[in-house]
Regions:
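Glycine-rich, small/hydroxylated-residue low-complexity segments
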Residues: 1-162
Length: 162
């Protein structure tokens, strides 16, 4: 964590992450590595809040995912970046660019991690990977409005309020 004027940046990385299936019932998250760099606007004020008050303090705030990377050990990599904000009711808004490599393997890993979205994730990533070509990166924009996530006109799912 580092201070940037009134803002706060959070950054870190970890490899060989294993998610305990007991905390993700019905989901299998493959072994992965991850890194992140996230900026929270007016974060100094928010981190000074009592822990129980932080969720409420985040409402109405803006931030930026500068970079968040997940690399699955069995193949597939996703990077996300873009501005995000929470409205006064805790619903997320954002325009996130998702860039990925090895879309087929990434689609398989994400389908196991998010089985309720598998029917959308696997074909979308496979099609984008096919369009990009072998060993190339592909990108798509995820639009999030009031917690509703879509890729273009295709609805992906919902993110509950904080």
């Amino acid at each position: 964590m580092r201070r940037e004027d009134k803002d706060v940046a959070f950054a870190g990385e970890a490899g060989g992450l294993s998610i305990d299936p007991a905390i993700t019932p019905g989901r299998t998250i493959p072994l992965l590595s991850a890194s992140y760099d996230v900026l929270l606007k007016d974060g100094v004020r928010i981190i000074a809040a009592k822990p129980k008050d932080i969720p409420a303090a985040l409402r109405g705030q803006r931030g930026e995912i500068r970079s968040a990377v997940v690399i699955f050990d069995e193949g597939g990599e996703a990077r996300v970046a873009g501005p995000v904000s929470l409205d006064s009711t805790g619903l997320l808004d954002g325009d996130i660019t998702v860039t990925f490599k090895d879309g087929d393997k990434l689609g398989q890993a994400l389908a196991r991690a998010i089985p309720e979205a598998a029917s959308v994730i696997k074909p979308a990533l496979s099609a984008a990977a096919l369009a990009a070509g072998k060993d190339k990166e592909a990108s798509l924009i995820l639009t999030i409005r009031k917690g509703k996530v879509s890729a273009g006109f295709i609805p992906i799912g919902n993110i509950p309020a904080l």
